[in-house]
C-alpha cells in the first residue's frame, strides 16, 4: 500500500489538471500559432508559465485504484499487476480467464 500522502497528492494533481486543461490548451494554441505576432505569443508563454505546475497533465502519475502502487500498472484496468492478478484469479474481473495452451 502506498503512502496516503502520495495518493492524495496525485488526486489533487488530477483535479488541477482537469480544471486547467482548457486554459492550458488555449494558451498552447496561441504559442504554437506562427501567424500571430511574436508579442502575443510571448505574452501567452508568460501566462502559461504563471499557471501552477501541478496543473499540467504530465505531473499526474497513473496509480493503482486499490493499492496506490505507482509502478506496473495496466491502463485498461487502472490496477497494478499484483492487484490485477489477485482479482483475476478470484474471478472478480469479467471475461478474464487464466491462459493455458
From Swiss-Prot:
Q: Name one GO molecular function term.
A: rRNA binding
Which stretches are annotated as coiled coil?
Answer: none
Subunit architecture = Part of the 30S ribosomal subunit. Contacts proteins S3 and S10.
Q: What does this protein do?
A: Binds 16S rRNA, required for the assembly of 30S particles and may also be responsible for determining the conformation of the 16S rRNA at the A site.
Which PROSITE patterns does the entry link to? RIBOSOMAL_S14
TM region(s), chain numbering: none
GO term, biological process aspect, one: translation
| Keywords, alphabetical | Ribonucleoprotein, Ribosomal protein, RNA-binding, rRNA-binding
Q: Which family does it belong to?
A: Belongs to the universal ribosomal protein uS14 family.
Identify the domain of life.
Bacteria
The protein here is known as: Small ribosomal subunit protein uS14
Among the Pfam families in the record, one is: Ribosomal_S14
Native source species: Acidiphilium cryptum (strain JF-5)
Q: Which PANTHER family match?
A: 30S RIBOSOMAL PROTEIN S14 (PTHR19836), SMALL RIBOSOMAL SUBUNIT PROTEIN US14M (PTHR19836:SF19)
Region Disordered: start-end pairs: 1-20
Its cellular-component GO annotations read: cytoplasm; small ribosomal subunit
Amino acid at each position: 500500500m502506498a503512502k496516503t500522502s502520495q495518493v492524495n497528492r496525485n488526486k489533487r494533481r488530477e483535479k488541477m489538471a482537469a480544471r486547467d486543461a482548457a486554459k492550458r490548451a488555449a494558451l498552447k494554441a496561441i504559442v504554437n500559432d506562427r501567424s500571430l505576432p511574436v508579442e502575443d505569443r510571448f505574452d501567452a508563454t508568460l501566462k502559461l508559465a504563471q499557471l501552477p505546475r501541478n496543473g499540467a497533465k504530465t505531473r499526474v502519475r497513473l496509480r493503482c485504484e486499490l493499492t496506490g502502487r505507482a509502478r506496473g500498472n495496466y491502463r485498461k484496468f487502472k490496477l497494478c499487476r499484483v492487484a490485477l492478478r489477485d482479482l483475476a484469479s478470484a474471478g472478480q474481473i469479467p471475461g478474464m480467464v487464466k491462459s493455458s495452451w
